[in-house]
Amino acid sequence: MNVIEGAIAAPNAKIAIVIARFNSFINESLLAGALDALKRQGQVSDDNITVVRCPGAYELPLVAQQVAKSDRYDAIVALGSVIRGGTPHFDYVAGECNKGLAQVALEYNTPVAFGVLTVDSIEQAIERAGTKAGNKGAEAALSALEMVNVLSQIES
């Protein structure tokens, strides 16, 4: 029986991080976690990491699509945060962001790791951006590296 599993180390991987500016006080912590994981655990050099900023989570899929279309990156890490408010806006933004990023991954055969927090409160966002609940940016970055290695093994 053959088992394909992806390692986390991917020193030659070219990674694009697309990050929303809206809720930047949360997103910058996600970015710090992602960069730390890529460099320390994934052994990816600074030269192989590109950070692309966009206005908000709703814009992440279009930016990710253009990054994937460039065919210069092995994986994309999408980072942002959508915090529930008193209107249905949260549902629209979170849903379309999720759907759009998944579509990019399938359309361009490029791993797109979902590091977008969809939370009910600012406290939950803070917990998931590096305090009680770990750093979801770091988790997304490691997921992207693992997918690069899994797909590489499948293709070889």
Swiss-Prot record:
Q: Which residues form the active site?
A: 89 (proton donor)
Q: Where does 5-amino-6-(D-ribitylamino)uracil bind?
A: 22, 57-59, 81-83, 114
The EC class name is transferase
Reactions catalysed, semicolon-separated, are: (2S)-2-hydroxy-3-oxobutyl phosphate + 5-amino-6-(D-ribitylamino)uracil = 6,7-dimethyl-8-(1-D-ribityl)lumazine + phosphate + 2 H2O + H(+)
One GO MF term attached to the UniProt entry: 6,7-dimethyl-8-ribityllumazine synthase activity
Task: Give the protein's function.
Answer: Catalyzes the formation of 6,7-dimethyl-8-ribityllumazine by condensation of 5-amino-6-(D-ribitylamino)uracil with 3,4-dihydroxy-2-butanone 4-phosphate. This is the penultimate step in the biosynthesis of riboflavin.
User: What is the protein name for this chain?
Assistant: 6,7-dimethyl-8-ribityllumazine synthase
